[in-house]
Amino acid sequence: LLSWTNSYEVCGLRLLIGSSAGDPSPFLPPQTEDFQSRGNPDLSIEFYEDDRAAADPLKYFFPPKFVLARQESGFAFIGINGRKRQLGTISSARDRGRMGVPRLDGVWRIAEERGFVEEALQGFVRACLQGRLLAAAGTFLHAAGIELDGNGYAFVGHTRAGKTTLARHFPASHLLGDDLVAIRETERFMLFGTPWPGREGGRVGSGGVPLKAIFNLDRTHPKGLQRMQPAQAVAELAVNAPR
């Protein structure tokens, strides 16, 4: 029986998060509250109380490294801790996810326990959303996203390429994200903000606008704009997609 539920709209998808293990909202990015919405969900995520996770959260969720593995019934969310441990599941239709967690409103023995639970919980939400996005002709993208005159512009680049620095030069009302955005094809390609900033204090936006262009920031090239060849552009986008 779910004791807590809330609905959001992320990347143009309706997301329902429910929990029978206490309120998970303090473990989500603070900006998530700006994405609250109503409507029938495209994706439902459930967190339930799990005795194995509660026995030793630090050992169960450390280190915060996760992968997805295909199963007959869908996908497994795996934590890598010397050996692979299944932490959650995602349906084959990628419209439902379930993960066991300790009691979320309980007392933590040390602060690190809460921190690792938070990283696993957010990692699972991102994995579920990425799976649903892929099923809906979309993907997350490590990029800064800007809205100008009703159009969206994404700026990808390797670490320290300048995505966050560039984002600081735009008013908050024009910013979709300084690190993680989403692209999805509906009637046309759309650029969406997500609740995850690049760092503490980073800025995000909950809107979505038509995608006009993607720029690859590269400090090794002379200043200016150069059109990329399709193969090179696809390679750069693949590098900047979550893995």
Model-derived features with residue positions:
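Conserved glycine(s) of the Walker
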Residues: 161-163
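A noncatalytic interaction/capping subdomain that flanks phosphate/NTP-handling catalytic cores
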Residues: 1-159, 169-176, 181-243
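Hydrophobic positions on the alpha1 helix immediately C-terminal to the Walker A/P-loop
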Residues: 166
